[in-house]
Amino acid sequence: MPKPRVVHFLGGLSGIGEDLIYKLVCNNNRCSIVDTWYDLFVSKMSTELEIFSEKPFLFNPDLVNSNDLLLFFALDEKTVDLDGLAGIDCDVIILMNGDSPIEIQDARPNLIYIHDLISYSEVESLANKNLDELFDLCISNAEDFNFPSDKKHWWISQQDVAAGLVRLIDYTTPLPQLMHICGRRGWTIQETFEQLELLYSRTIAGSSGQFQTGHLESKPVIHPTVVKVSQITPSTRPDLSIINEVLVQIDGEGWRPLTPLRTSLMHYLATKDLD
């Protein structure tokens, strides 16, 4: 009888890594954590570990079995040391930032590029260059700025990515070598700023005691505008067909991110010092 599959966590685990570990612990999945993060995460989940039976253990390469899965989080890395993963005798998935593609010649490991991720962490301050620039504009109350009109971001929440990875974990059929993950809807910088500014102003008004009825007015997610056909640029969304097909094979649902942008931005704002 084969041993239960263990999910091994290596790399930079703050953000999506900690979210995924939490989900696995709550599902009583077995997992191990690299030593640099182990004590911090176990301490953070001490309450949950009193309830659920499967406590994460310290990663040991000698305890990796062929039916296990290793997840290497390299979202903040420009390069990945593949030689260090060569001796791992199990399925390996490297998660990388979609803005930092790498080339791999052999069939192992699998790559998942995550584009326009909105992440947050309870253990470390995370940077998001694009959102941080918009956040600075909110703080300065700037009015004289120009955004690129056609560039879109395909924002995806940390929760949706973690939920998708949970579905992949028990899938024993070999995965495609390369998959992309992002949101299904594109947002311009202007549209993103409008959403962030709305949430920021409501948050500041509430914390300062200056909340007014105007802050409760329903605001459209986007403002409808008429654009000439000649000004419409082709979609640059990453290819979601592969991840969608794999998830359809798993449970018939496909890739269906459910978290609204405003919810993701609220998680982002919750990590900021608004005093």
Label every PLM stretch briefly.
Residues 1-65:
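N-terminal Rossmann/SDR dinucleotide-binding element
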Residues 1-4, 25-26, 61-68, 84-90, ...:
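Flexible, charged surface loops at secondary-structure boundaries
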Residues 69-123:
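Conserved Rossmann-fold NAD(P)-dependent oxidoreductase catalytic core, especially the SDR/UDP-sugar
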Residues 103-167, 196:
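NAD(P)-dependent short-chain dehydrogenase/reductase
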Residues 164-235, 257-275:
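Mid/C-terminal beta-alpha module of Rossmann-like enzyme folds, strongest
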